[in-house]
C-alpha cells in the first residue's frame, strides 16, 4: 500500500517539476491508511453484475445492498434493458450513503414506466435492505429515457419515494445532496482535503476577499470559520440548487454570494473588471474538474495578473493542471501539497500555489 502512495507522490510531483523552481516547496503526500472498500458511492450497470464482486473501492455494505437490489430486479416481471435489441426496462442503479447510514438510490429505466411501477413498488425491498444491512433507504429517484441513449443529468428525473436528498456533514456544515450534485466519494479523506486547503492558504488569517470557482465552492467556502466576503462561482445547476438549500439550513460564518456560472462567463467578467486601483486584495481559488479551466477563465487570469499576482489551484488531474499553467504562461509553483484522495486509482489531488 505505502509503496503505491510513494509512487503516486513521485508521479504527481514529477509531472509539475517544469513549473517549479529551486525554492518551490513540495510537501509529503497526505493519505488515509485505507485503500480498499472506502467509497460511499456505487453505480451498477444491470447488464454487468460482475461489477459487484470485482469492486474493491466501494464500501462492502453498498456492494451487499447492490446484490439485494440486483436480485430484486432480476426477479421482477420487467426485463433488464438490452442495448443490442433496444428492448427491456431496467438499465442501471446507483447508490450513495452518508455517515448516518442513510441511503440515496437513483434508478434509470427505459421507456414508459407509469403503468409499471409506483411509489409502493419498492416497499418490501426497502425493508429487506434495512433488516439485512441496517441502512435506511432515505430516498429513491427515478430517471427515464425514451431510448438507449442516457438522458442528460437533469432530464426526466423525479423523486420517486422518500424525502428529497440526504445530508453529508463536512467540517460542521450539513450539505444537502441529491443525484448529480457534487459530493466526495471518500469520507475518510474528504475533510482532510478541505482542512488541508484552508491550512495551506492560512485562510482564516488571510484578510482578503475570496473569489472561488468550482463545483465544490460550497465545501471550500461554507466551511470557513472566519467572517469574510466570498464570490462563489459554480458551473452546475444541481449544485446551485443544493447549495442554496444548504445555506438556509446552516449557520454560515462567511458573507457569500453564490453564482450559477455554466459557461464561466461571470467569474471571467469578475476577474476582467477588477480595478487595479482597488486596495482590497483578492484571494483567488480555482477548483476545476478533470477537464481543467475553460479558456475564458485562463484569459481572465492572465489579464488580471497585475492585481491577483498569485492564486490557488485545486487539481484533480495533473495533465489538465499542466496544460492550464502552460496556457497561463509566465508563472511558477511556489508550493504544492499532494493528497491521495482516491486510493487504488490513478488520480491524485494536488493543491498548488501559483505565482504570476
Curated annotation (Swiss-Prot):
User: From the record, what ranges are coiled-coil?
Assistant: none
- Alphabetically, which GO biological process terms does the record hold? methylation; RNA processing
Q: Which UniProt keywords apply?
A: Methyltransferase, S-adenosyl-L-methionine, Transferase, Virion
- Write down the InterPro entries for this protein, in alphabetical order: SAM-dependent_MTases_sf, TRM2_met, U5_MeTrfase_fam
- Listed PROSITE patterns: SAM_MT_RNA_M5U (PS51687)
Query: Which residues hold S-adenosyl-L-methionine?
Result: 184
**Top-level taxon of the source organism:** Viruses
- Where are the catalytic residues? 316
Give its E.C. classification number: 2.1.1.-
A GO cellular component annotated for this chain's UniProt record is: virion component
Subcellular location per UniProt equals: Virion
Gene3D superfamilies documented for this protein: 2.40.50.1070, Vaccinia Virus protein VP39 (3.40.50.150)
Q: Name one GO molecular function term.
A: RNA binding
UniProt lists the family membership as follows: Belongs to the class I-like SAM-binding methyltransferase superfamily. RNA M5U methyltransferase family.
Protein name per UniProt: Putative RNA methyltransferase R407
